[in-house]
C-alpha cells in the first residue's frame, strides 16, 4: 500500500508530465520554429521573374542570390525563426509550408505580400 501513498505525490508529478507531453505532442504539428529561406523583392514584376526561374529548375539559393533584395549573399537563408518574430502574412505562410530541400523545393506560389514587399518562402526545417 505505501506505493499508493507515493502515487498521490506521483499523480501531481504525472499531471506535470502530462502537460509536458501535451506540449511535445503539439510541437510536431505546427512547431515553434522554422528554418526559412526567402526571396524578397519590392516590385511584383521582379518577384515573378524569380518565380519563373524557380519553376524552370534553378536552385532556390541561386535565385535568391540573383533576385532577393534581402540576405541575398546567404542564398536567402534567414536561419531559425520563431513564432512571433516574423510579420503576420510571412509567419502564416512559413508555418503552413511543408519542409522541403534544395533538390525538391516547396515554396509559396503566389508570393506573399508584406509591408517589406513580395516574398517567395521556402522552409528547410521545423522544430
Curated annotation (Swiss-Prot):
Its EC number is 5.2.1.8. The keyword Transmembrane helix does not apply. It holds the Pfam family Rotamase_3. Residues 31-125 form the PpiC domain. Coiled coil: none annotated. Belongs to the PpiC/parvulin rotamase family. PIN4 subfamily. This is Peptidyl-prolyl cis-trans isomerase NIMA-interacting 4.
Amino acid at each position: 500500500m505505501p506505493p499508493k501513498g507515493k502515487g498521490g505525490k506521483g499523480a501531481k508529478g504525472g499531471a506535470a508530465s502530462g502537460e509536458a507531453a501535451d506540449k511535445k505532442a503539439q510541437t510536431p504539428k505546427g512547431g515553434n520554429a522554422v528554418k526559412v529561406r526567402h526571396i524578397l523583392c519590392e516590385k511584383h514584376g521582379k518577384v515573378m521573374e524569380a518565380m519563373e526561374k524557380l519553376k524552370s529548375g534553378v536552385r532556390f539559393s541561386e535565385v535568391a542570390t540573383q533576385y532577393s533584395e534581402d540576405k541575398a549573399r546567404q542564398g536567402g537563408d534567414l536561419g531559425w525563426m520563431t513564432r512571433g518574430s516574423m510579420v503576420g502574412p510571412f509567419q502564416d505562410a512559413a508555418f503552413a509550408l511543408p519542409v522541403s530541400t534544395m533538390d525538391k523545393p516547396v515554396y509559396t506560389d503566389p508570393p506573399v505580400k508584406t509591408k517589406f514587399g513580395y516574398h517567395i518562402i521556402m522552409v528547410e526545417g521545423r522544430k
